[in-house]
Curated annotation (Swiss-Prot):
Superkingdom of source: Eukaryota
Tissues with expression: Expressed by the venom gland.
InterPro entries attached to this UniProt entry: DH2-like (IPR034439)
Identification of the protein by name: Venom protein 55.1
Compartments reported by the entry: Secreted
GO biological process: body fluid secretion
Lineage of origin: Eukaryota, Metazoa, Ecdysozoa, Arthropoda, Chelicerata
Chain positions listed as propeptide in the UniProt record: 61-73
One GO CC term on file: extracellular space
Major localization class: secreted
Entry function: Regulates fluid secretion.
Residues of the signal peptide: 1-19
Residues found modified as Proline amide: 57
Annotated source species: Lychas mucronatus
Length: 73
């Protein structure tokens, strides 16, 4: 949720910078003006963020009861 809020603020700043600095030689480029690549970066960052979470995708490491394995019949 926080990442989406940050992404929204960055896109808002990018759109504001285009309006105010259109006559400037060097503009602030935050990757949003490049079209599809900006969304690709956003998806990659969301994927990395979800992979780092404990309940995210990937192999689940289960703790098991060693006593139950030894005494299983």
């Amino acid at each position: 949720m926080n990442f989406l809020c940050i992404l929204f603020v960055v896109s808002l700043i990018s759109s504001l910078s285009k309006c105010t600095t259109s006559s400037m030689k060097r503009e602030l480029d935050l990757g949003m003006s490049r079209g599809h690549s900006g969304s690709q970066v956003g998806k990659a960052l969301l994927g990395i963020q979800s992979a780092n979470r404990t309940d995210g995708p990937g192999r689940k490491r289960r703790s098991f009861d060693l006593y139950a394995l030894v005494n299983a019949k």
